[in-house]
Design a protein with these regions (language model features):
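Catalytic cores of DNA base-excision repair glycosylases
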Residues: 2-223
Length: 224
């Protein structure tokens, strides 16, 4: 990290991300707010790639709350088993589908409080749905964003709640929905948790914590 101010570092990161990912696609395949909600729920401790291989079979069985609420939980569990945590996730999918039918006219609510009241839906899942399904300014923080905000010296890294507060404070609200996707793609490509090639990570090299860069170079030299 050089003598740049925090606002200059934020501006550099945003410009670099915009240049690399001008139109970042939503990683999870979906058709509407309901299929996105289910896909995000399945993505807990699972890769988006694997979720995208599982959801076609699940949505062939049922792709709306009414039809899903009529399914047997064991059948849902069998289909989603490759995503992991299938007992918990299948129960949540069935229960939230029933709740959408009973309390929300079979519609996914565009409301944080109502979303977080659904079984299996936490703040991050609700934020993804609000951002990607309803285009409501949100900043979902996953492990990738949490890691990069720390590496870039833009958050203390204490917890994801603090990282979200810092991201919302530092980045303009008009950019939140796009930025969180841009950071995820950058993290996966150039600043992963494992197999990190620091010399290719142009943003961290420019604005990152000096100690983080030094440690990464030491690890890279041992691998060489």
């Amino acid at each position: 990290m050089d003598s740049m101010s925090k606002s200059e570092r934020v501006a550099f990161a945003m410009a670099e991300l915009e240049a690399r990912y001008p139109a970042p696609p939503i990683p999870l395949d979906h058709r509407d707010a309901y299929t996105l909600l289910v896909s995000v729920l399945l993505s807990a401790q699972c890769t988006d790639k694997r979720v995208n291989t599982v959801t076609p079979g699940l949505f062939e069985l049922a792709d709306n709350p009414r039809d899903m609420a009529r399914q047997d939980v064991d059948e849902i569990r069998a289909i989603i088993r490759p995503c992991g945590l299938s007992p918990r996730k299948s129960a949540a999918i069935l229960k939230l589908s029933q709740m959408l039918c009973d309390e929300h006219n079979e519609q996914v609510p565009c409301d944080f409080e109502a979303l977080e009241a659904l079984p299996g839906v936490g703040h991050k899942t609700a934020s993804v749905v609000m951002s990607q399904a309803f285009d409501v300014p949100s900043f979902p923080v996953d492990t990738h964003i949490h890691r990069l905000m720390w590496r870039w010296g833009l958050s203390s890294g204490k917890n994801v709640e603090q990282t979200e507060r810092d991201a919302k404070r530092l980045f303009p609200e008009s950019r939140w929905n796009k930025l969180h996707l841009q950071i995820i793609y950058y993290a996966r490509e150039l600043s992963p948790a494992r197999g990190w090639r620091i010399e290719e990570d142009v943003i961290t090299l420019k604005i990152g914590r000096k100690a983080v860069i030094a440690d990464a170079r030491k690890i890279a030299s041992r691998r060489a």
